[in-house]
Amino acid sequence: MKPDIHPDYHEVAVTCSCGNNFKTRSTYQGSELNVEVCSACHPFFTGKQKIMDTAGQVDKFRRRYGM
């Protein structure tokens, strides 16, 4: 790697709106970062995501277009 062309890579304290705190390394220029969603409260990671009723949507489409 060439010297003096890469951004500073340092430790950053991340705070989520749910109250979760963790540290990571980043090129973010501040020492603290506030986020709205993290892996502790995101629906994908918590398993509380809404499952879309695709079968109902297909039936609705077929009724609408006479298939």
From Swiss-Prot:
<dbReference type="GO" id="GO:0006412">
    <property type="term" value="P:translation"/>
</dbReference>
<comment type="subunit">
    <text>Part of the 50S ribosomal subunit.</text>
</comment>
<protein>
    <recommendedName>
        <fullName>Large ribosomal subunit protein bL31</fullName>
    </recommendedName>
</protein>
<dbReference type="GO" id="GO:0019843">
    <property type="term" value="F:rRNA binding"/>
</dbReference>
<dbReference type="GO" id="GO:0046872">
    <property type="term" value="F:metal ion binding"/>
</dbReference>
<dbReference type="InterPro" id="IPR042105">
    <property type="entry name" value="Ribosomal_bL31_sf"/>
</dbReference>
<keyword id="KW-0687">Ribonucleoprotein</keyword>
<feature type="binding site">
    <location>
        <position position="16"/>
    </location>
    <ligand>
        <name>Zn(2+)</name>
    </ligand>
</feature>
<dbReference type="GO" id="GO:0005840">
    <property type="term" value="C:ribosome"/>
</dbReference>
<dbReference type="InterPro" id="IPR002150">
    <property type="entry name" value="Ribosomal_bL31"/>
</dbReference>
<dbReference type="GO" id="GO:1990904">
    <property type="term" value="C:ribonucleoprotein complex"/>
</dbReference>
<keyword id="KW-0689">Ribosomal protein</keyword>
<feature type="binding site">
    <location>
        <position position="38"/>
    </location>
    <ligand>
        <name>Zn(2+)</name>
    </ligand>
</feature>
<comment type="similarity">
    <text>Belongs to the bacterial ribosomal protein bL31 family. Type A subfamily.</text>
</comment>
<keyword id="KW-0862">Zinc</keyword>
<comment type="function">
    <text>Binds the 23S rRNA.</text>
</comment>
<dbReference type="GO" id="GO:0003735">
    <property type="term" value="F:structural constituent of ribosome"/>
</dbReference>
<feature type="binding site">
    <location>
        <position position="41"/>
    </location>
    <ligand>
        <name>Zn(2+)</name>
    </ligand>
</feature>
<keyword id="KW-0479">Metal-binding</keyword>
<feature type="binding site">
    <location>
        <position position="18"/>
    </location>
    <ligand>
        <name>Zn(2+)</name>
    </ligand>
</feature>
<dbReference type="InterPro" id="IPR034704">
    <property type="entry name" value="Ribosomal_bL28/bL31-like_sf"/>
</dbReference>
<dbReference type="Pfam" id="PF01197">
    <property type="entry name" value="Ribosomal_L31"/>
</dbReference>
<dbReference type="InterPro" id="IPR027491">
    <property type="entry name" value="Ribosomal_bL31_A"/>
</dbReference>
<keyword id="KW-0699">rRNA-binding</keyword>
<keyword id="KW-0694">RNA-binding</keyword>
